[in-house]
Amino acid sequence: MSLQDGEARAVLMRAVLYMAVATFLFATMNALAKYIMITPGGASIGALQVTFCRYLSGTIFLLPVLLWARVVPRTRHPEKYALRAGFGAAGVVLMFLAFQTIPLANATAIGFSSPIFTMILAVLFLGERAGRMRWLAAAIGFSGVIAIAGPDGNVLNTGSLIAIASALCMGVEVAALKWVSRLGDKPLVMLFMGNFLGAVLVAPFAIPTWVWPEPWQWLPLA
C-alpha cells in the first residue's frame, strides 16, 4: 500500500470516527428532548420551545469560539443561509413532534433516511453523480424505513409521516449546506448562521407559547 493510499485510509477512518461520535451525540440530544417533553412532574414543554432553546444555546456557545478564532460571523448571502436554516428548523421541530407520538427508536431510525433525500437532491440540483450501487443502497435503505414506519402494515400513521417529513427537511438542509459551502464562508460562520438564524426563525412561534421550565429541565433543554 502506497503512502498516499495510507493517508487516504487514515482520513476515511477519522471521518468514520467523527460520524460515529456525531451520531451518538445526536441520539443523546434526541433522548433528552423526548425526556423533558414527556416526563411527568416537569413543565409541559413543547417541540417549538425545545427547538428554540437548542438553537439559542448553540448560538451562545459559539460566540466565545468565534471570539477566540477571531472570526466575524458575516456573509454576503444571508437569504441562502436563512433558507437552509428554515428547513433545518422545520426538520428539528417535526422530529421532536414525532417523539411525542411514536417510540424514540422508530423516529430516530426513520430520521436516518435523511441522507437518501440528500443524495437525490444533490443529484438533481447540485450536479453530483450517484452510481448504481448508491441508488441500490438508497432503495434498500428506504425499504427499511418503510418497514420501521409501518411494521403492522400501517405506514400512514401520523407519527411516522411526521418523522419522514422531518427526514426530508433535514435532507434538504444538508443539501443546502453543501450549496452554501460554495460561497466561500468559513465553517464557523456557516455553523453560527445555522444556529442563530434557526433561533430567529423559531422564536416567533416558540415565545408566545413559552412555558417556564422546572430547574432540573434547564440542562437537558440546552
Which stretches of residues belong to each language-model region?
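Glycine-/small-residue-enriched transmembrane alpha-helix faces in small-molecule transporters
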Residues: 1-48, 154-179
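Loop-to-transmembrane-helix transition segments
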Residues: 14-22, 70-94, 158-166, 212-222
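Transmembrane alpha-helices of multi-pass small-molecule transport proteins
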Residues: 43-90, 169-173, 193-208
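Alpha-helical transmembrane segments of compact multi-pass small-molecule transporters, enriched
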Residues: 57-61, 110-124, 139, 196-201
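C-terminal transmembrane-helix exit sites in multi-pass transporters
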Residues: 97-100, 114-136
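Hydrophobic transmembrane alpha-helices of multi-pass small-molecule transport proteins
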Residues: 133-150
